[in-house]
A protein has these predicted regions:
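ATP-binding N-terminal substructure of ATP-dependent carboxylate-amine bond-forming enzymes
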Residues: 1-104, 383-397
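Short amphipathic alpha-helical segments and helix-helix/interface helices
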Residues: 15-19, 118, 141, 177
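Short acidic-hydrophobic, aromatic-tinged amphipathic segments that line or gate anion-handling sites
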Residues: 50-57, 132-136, 165-168
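A conserved helix-loop-beta module that forms one wall/lid of the active-site cleft
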Residues: 94-163
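Conserved ATP-binding module of the ATP-grasp superfamily
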Residues: 127-129, 146, 150-153, 162-198, ...
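Short beta-strand-to-turn element immediately C-terminal to the catalytic PLP-Schiff-base lysine
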Residues: 134, 164-169, 202-204, 267
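ATP-dependent carboxylate/phosphate-activation module, predominantly the ATP-grasp catalytic core
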Residues: 190-255, 259, 266, 270, ...
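Peripheral (often C-terminal) accessory segments that flank ATP-dependent C-N-forming ligase machineries
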Residues: 309-398
């Protein structure tokens, strides 16, 4: 089997996808925008061969690299990146080289535009926040008057919470509108008073779920990015209603042999026009592995290896590795801009036995993950909550 992996070096832990394939005898052929010496020994060791291209947006260069791999290795079975940014590139390569596994360009359009994602949720019978694609400030103001403030404005196609703004009144909406890139289509949504819960997992070729877990995000990514808030997320087993909704979404897309990451809101209070407290609303779909250190959180929470489960799904179309939910795993990220009561040494003294990883975050991911972060294990909700309170306690104001 031959697999081309786009940008295997970023994020830094993604080499694990390549390593599990190579360990099973797969030729893993990398194409990336970092020189060979810069991608790190673990990544280098996970690859059969690597082609450095200074700019992966140079499609002619990428095309030539793929063609050369095919000339020397034969048929390519999969094109993968597990990275939202490169999904369109993955799809274009599949089309140009007639690689039948994985979505083509028409399908990735539905997977990368928020408006089309919401239509897919609605087709599956899952409600969403009301939304529009405003073509003018007047359109945006009319929508806000119809649904009520606050409203959220963000690119219809985009990764994470970048360029996302909230407006609590017409003056703020005008400011957010003027700050947007006029060459980019934005989507406007009513604000949802809730928190994010995800349904994440891996499928086989019949879109059966081989593995699933859930992330709970009490502080929205938008607030973490725009307001410099602390970053917290928990890994736990999916609730039954979340799992059922997630499986309905799997039927709406080409989700054969993929790692998926589906986002939902759960209402924290009743809201007219949306539902009662506890209602699930569709937010976004991501047809790739969840970002940050979520795959590693899954491994710790389930005593498993999701990279292996993913590799086995591609090669054997089965899951061999066991893994049941055992414990809560929490990502707690602190921002350098915030003064905290406890030092890192004090945190280690109290919670060291619970820390499974502690790390500095890559600069490109600081807004979403914090500057310095911990992954901690907890056997109960009470212990989990105490960890978060202790690590994020602020210094007393003078």
């Amino acid at each position: 089997m031959n697999v081309i992996f786009i940008s295997p070096h970023f994020p830094s832990h993604f080499f694990n996808f390549c390593a599990r394939l190579k360990e099973r005898g797969v030729n893993v052929l990398g194409i990336g925008d970092a020189p060979w010496d810069a991608i790190g020994a673990p990544c280098r060791n996970s690859l059969t061969e690597y082609r450095f291209i200074g700019d992966l947006h140079d499609y002619d260069a990428v095309y030539r690299a793929v063609a050369d791999y095919i000339f020397r290795y034969g048929k390519i079975d999969y094109i993968e990146s597990e990275n939202e940014y490169w999904l369109d590139l993955d799809a274009r390569i599949r089309e140009d080289f007639n690689i039948t596994t994985g979505p083509k360009t028409a399908e990735t359009e539905r997977m990368t535009h928020k408006s089309l994602m919401k239509k897919a949720y609605q087709d599956a019978g899952i409600p969403t926040a009301r939304w529009t694609l405003p073509q003018s400030l007047e359109d945006a103001l009319i929508f806000a008057r119809d649904v009520g403030y606050p409203v959220v404005l963000k690119p219809d196609k985009g990764v994470g919470a970048s360029n996302t703004g909230r407006a609590d009144n017409s003056v703020e909406l005008e400011i957010v509108w003027e700050k947007r890139d006029p060459n980019v289509q934005f989507i406007e949504e009513e604000y949802v008073p809730g928190h994010v819960e995800t349904f994440d997992g891996i499928t086989d070729s019949d879109r059966n779920v081989l593995f699933a877990a859930s992330q709970i995000v009490p502080v929205s990514l938008m607030d973490a990015v725009n307001n410099g808030e602390d970053v917290v997320s928990y890994c736990q087993a999916p609730t039954p209603d979340l799992e059922e909704a997630g499986k309905q979404i799997l039927k709406q897309f080409d989700t054969r042999n993929i790692f998926f990451h589906f986002e939902f809101f759960r209402l924290d209070r009743d809201k007219e026009g949306l539902g009662k407290k506890g209602t699930l609303l569709g937010l976004e779909v991501n047809m790739r592995a969840p970002g940050g250190r979520i795959p590693d959180k899954m491994n710790y929470a389930y005593d498993t290896d999701v990279y292996t489960i993913w590799a086995d799904s591609l090669i054997y179309d089965k899951r061999f590795m066991s893994g049941e939910f055992k414990r809560y795993i929490t990502h707690v990220g602190r921002k350098d801009s915030i003064g905290y009561a406890k030092s890192e040494e004090e945190i280690q003294a109290r919670w060291g036995a619970n820390v499974v990883e502690e790390f500095d975050v890559a600069p490109a991911l600081v807004n979403e993950m914090g500057n310095h972060a911990w992954l901690l294990r907890a056997d109960s909700l009470e212990e989990r909550n105490e960890q978060v309170r202790d690590i994020l306690q602020r210094k007393a104001s003078v």
